[in-house]
Amino acid sequence: MLRTSCGGMLLLVHALGLVRAQFPRACVTPEGLRSAQCCPSPSALESDPCGALAGPGRCVDVRMRAHGPQYPYEGATTRALARASSRACRCNGNFGGFDCGGCAHGFTGDACEQRVPVVRRNVMQLSADEKRFFVNALDQAKRAPHPDTVIATRRYSEILGPDNSTTQFENISIYNLFVWTHYYSVSKTFLGAGQDSFGGVDFSHEGPGFLTWHRYHLLQLERDMQVMLGDPSFALPYWDFAIGGSECDICTDELMGARSSSDSSSISSNSIFSRWRVICESVEEYDTLGTICNSSESSPIRRNPAGNTARPMVQRLPEPQDVEACLELTAFDSPPFYSTSSDSFRNSIEGYSAPQGNYDPVVRSLHNLAHLFLNGTGGQTHLSPNDPIFVLLHTFTDAVFDEWLRRHASDASIYPLENTPIGHNREFNMVPFWPPVTNAEMFVTAAENLGYSYEAEWPARPLTPTQIVTVAVVAALLLVAIIFAASTCVVHLRGNRTEGRQPLLGDQYQRYEDHNKTQSVV
């Protein structure tokens, strides 16, 4: 039976010797690291990399592309990935996973030939049992070690240990890996002791890759949880945060945790999430000492929805019409392909522009507004996935993205090919996922290409001027038809009344039976 895991091993590749990327555990042996090849065999046969003998996959060169001039430290982040591995598995057909020994999302079976419905639904519309199951599944993922993934505990120069043969890695849970991956994508580039770290890098925000990066991020968590639960149909639900008002409808003990009665910024002790602890909190230490975020947990989740009285703008959730306005924008993104872009669907759903597309440095809308509304762990970019509301918030953001792709019949050709922020170009590999996956591969409709779909209702679309004219013409024609039909009925009715005033037949008119007795009477 084929494994359904698509997990990878997170190995940091960073400046001056810090390795940062995502690799399978099988690739982080001393021999694997020295070979610079990560093509494990699903059958554990050295002669069968990526299942090439049976056909699931093949070992290919990893294509690296140079960053633009806006990034002066070429080789400091993902470019150093080539030092760790320059070859990876590329799976065929419906096969998937780091060694092509599993199935792609939405498929199962020995040959990955059976489709499995993976339907993401509104979390508020789940039954009580379904809500309980989801909450417990998240908690299980928080505690369960990832079956295929470990993280580096030393920089690249120290990764083989003092004896040059003991690799420096540790286990991490499924959910904490989800948090760690996001932290890495926004972390600064460490340039060495005594130097300020370079902060002009964000692989997952403020650029075209915002939507594609988070889409794959969610796919990895969903797939890991499917494997954990032994259920390939498990789907992450979404939180429709565009409800307006200042109430967090999912902040109940039945779902993501109510507000604590003793501390307005804490989660109720009746919620399982009050016992969760965050990782990747020591940002100053990482940036100044060059240490690595590891699996060590620290403080509890903080959350105070609508509690930021210093910023009234973030005390209310987005409105339903904000989503519809955003969906009506026709351009996916616009120069400079950054948080200052106008008339950009991506920048509007991300929340740096107004829903209608106009850029305003003061505005925070949609995705950004929902994060800031939470007013705590979920409102800090490097920490935000520690609050599990992050999952529901981003699943809805992805649902809006998928609806936009459907409405505008868009394909990857409209995704910027170049001149975007570091890591955001169309054919760039998204950092730090392994095996490598490009932004273009995620710029597709989900149901037809990625193995999952949404059960969602969207606000009615406003009519375009052409549609308004068409409706007016049709309405006028219908009105004429109704008037004509009514006039015809009146004329016909008057005719019937005239006929009703005519005299009855008298005796002067012959009757059949009287005129000819032999005639048949009907």
Curated annotation (Swiss-Prot):
Keywords: Copper, Disulfide bond, Glycoprotein, Melanin biosynthesis, Membrane, Metal-binding, Monooxygenase, Oxidoreductase, Signal, Transmembrane, Transmembrane helix, Zinc. Contains bound zinc ions after heterologous expression in insect cells. Glycans are attached at residues 164, 171, 294, 375. The keyword rRNA-binding does not apply. Disulfide bonds join 27-38, 39-59, 50-89, 91-100, 103-112, 248-251, 280-293. Pfam families: Tyrosinase (PF00264). Residues 22-470 are lumenal, melanosome. PROSITE patterns: TYROSINASE_1, TYROSINASE_2. Residues 492-522 are cytoplasmic. Its cofactor is Cu(2+); Zn(2+). Zn(2+) B binds at residues 367, 371, 394. It is a single-pass type I membrane protein. GO terms for biological process: melanin biosynthetic process; melanocyte differentiation; melanosome organization. Zn(2+) A binds at residues 182, 205, 214. It catalyses: 2 5,6-dihydroxyindole-2-carboxylate + O2 = 2 indole-5,6-quinone-2-carboxylate + 2 H2O. It is found in: Melanosome membrane. Belongs to the tyrosinase family. Plays a role in melanin biosynthesis. Catalyzes the oxidation of 5,6-dihydroxyindole-2-carboxylic acid (DHICA) into indole-5,6-quinone-2-carboxylic acid. May regulate or influence the type of melanin synthesized. Also to a lower extent, capable of hydroxylating tyrosine and producing melanin. This is 5,6-dihydroxyindole-2-carboxylic acid oxidase.
